[in-house]
Curated annotation (Swiss-Prot):
Residues 578-597 bind DNA. ATP binds at residues 229-236. InterPro entries: AAA+_ATPase, DNA_helicase_pif1-like_DEAD, P-loop_NTPase, Pif1-like_2B_dom, PIF1_helicase, PIF1_RRM3_pfh1. DNA-dependent ATPase and 5'-3' DNA helicase required for the maintenance of both mitochondrial and nuclear genome stability. This is ATP-dependent DNA helicase PIF1. One of its GO terms (molecular function) is 5'-3' DNA helicase activity. Its main location: nucleus. One of its GO terms (cellular component) is mitochondrion.
Amino acid sequence: MMLAEQLSPEIQSSITIEYLNSSGQALKRKVIRNSFISLGRNEFRDLVLKVSDGKLQQNFVIKQIQLFTRFIRDGKASVVLLPENIQLLISNCPADKLKHFMKTLLIKHEAGKKEKPVNERTRLLSGLPRMFETISPVQKKDVEQANEMRAKANSETPVKGKGLSHKGVNGGNRCQQKRTRTESSNSLIADLRPSKKPTLSMPKQIRLSTEQSLVLNTVLSGRNVFFTGSAGTGKSYLLKRIVGALPPKSTYATASTGVAACHIGGTTLHAFAGIGSGKASLEQCIELAKRPGVRQHWTSCKHLIIDEISMVEGEFFDKLEAVARAVRGKDEPFGGIQLIVCGDFLQLPPVTQASSQTKFCFQGKSWRKCIHLTMELTEVRRQTDKNFISLLQAIRLGRCTDDVARQLLQTTNHKVERDGILATRLCTHKDDVEITNERRLQQLPGESHSYEALDSDPMLVKTINAQCPVNQQIQLKKGAQVMLAKNLDVSRGLVNGARGVVIKFEEGNKNLPVVRFLCGVTEVIKPDRWVFKGHGGIYLSRQQLPLKLAWAISIHKSQGMSLDCVEISLSRVFESGQAYVALSRARNLEGLRVMDFDPKVVRANPYVLQFYHQMQKERALRQTSLDDFLDKENC
């Protein structure tokens, strides 16, 4: 069952209230570190922003506003009240809640322009008691009224004025003169009206399954959680929602690999920790973590998210736990940091030296005292065919029955190619991937088109390469097999991993590629932007075409992807869980072709199987205890 998370028209954040003069300078400033901001209406049905610190409150009647939302992903936004010349700077607000709040404010304000305001004389003589009523949720009619007013404004002659370059809540750009001052000191009382206001839509609802909602609520209760689940159960999506529900200043989203970190808008666990590989002595690691910049990570962190935990080595996890206690000066597990850990130990294991034995995190000394609760997502979303889901579950547990082997062997003859789009080959070794893609591209006739990325800091290109899913340079030709590296339009099937072929290039100085996708959509692919955190908490970005060559891709790089048509060679599988990760990338059995299959490559680590068996046993005991308690209560 899917549940739509109801986001409230109230947010909790830090806020700075600035009273500006006509030049945009702050005459008076008030900072509230922990504020509650509510959207509602007063006795005259005016739109009102109520700001409270828990003791005192201040109401701001909204007449004209400007919204600045460029840094909304970081939990920051600004509301400028005109003509009062008051600026509200919101920060450290959970991103999902802030997006919903700002979208609601925008729609309600635009829709309200249709209503005739109450004049001052009527207000003075009304005798109505003061009141504040929380705003009702956005309805379809609000959006229709807002768009009606926008259409009317668009039909008028646009007026240009000075102001900030601004990206609005709904994605509209304002292209004005660039200012040299900071946002907090800008004069925002200009006769600014965008040349064309974009059409508004309903605020996006966050849809979670019952299982996912339970995990999210457990996280918000402050408990240390490890949640797991097989491939395609929505772990990454849930992690993004968890990131969006926590205060940004004290939340650090990390993952064992750069690509996984990029998917959740975070950084690598090693970059956050600042202790290198962790092979040094504990004393040396503590000294490394106490360096300026690194220490600030540890001391400001209240919520640490770790994705792809299966690839984190157990001894490294233990060392992090000890470092956290030492640097933070607290004896609680992990120095009192809330841990939100995600992954599937039945997928890819930690990368270790050939001579070393794999040690998973759950085998570490600190795991049990750090993790309060283990939860499992069981509802598979990537695949809908119950037979294929059952086959994958058997492979995940290292079981390859005669029936499973027969079905996989039959895929050898599957014709997964369609409309000139070939199957992507999943390879166990990344060297094979590069050789295959380069060779197949060179074999194509015609002119090669090169696309260089625009990086925020060319000096840190190695860091960007490690975290960004697309290369610094992309070479394409007509007929090149490609896949999307980012969700562009989920409703049209343009999702991360969607397969396509380059059919032509747009004429002009940019020569943008035109791609026909397997889902039936033909699209001009334009550069997109990835933003992620580097060392020291600095933000890095790359602007590049969201495309990758797709004749081949490594199993490691495919983790978290859903592929339309895939060919797998399992003869060189060398790790437990690798065959499962590869096979579970396919959306269905019809889009899968397995070459040189050997049942011996299907294996699961026995220690991991034991861990999951124990986990399910403990969960069954908890459920039995809960049922007994409820039975007694109902007697």
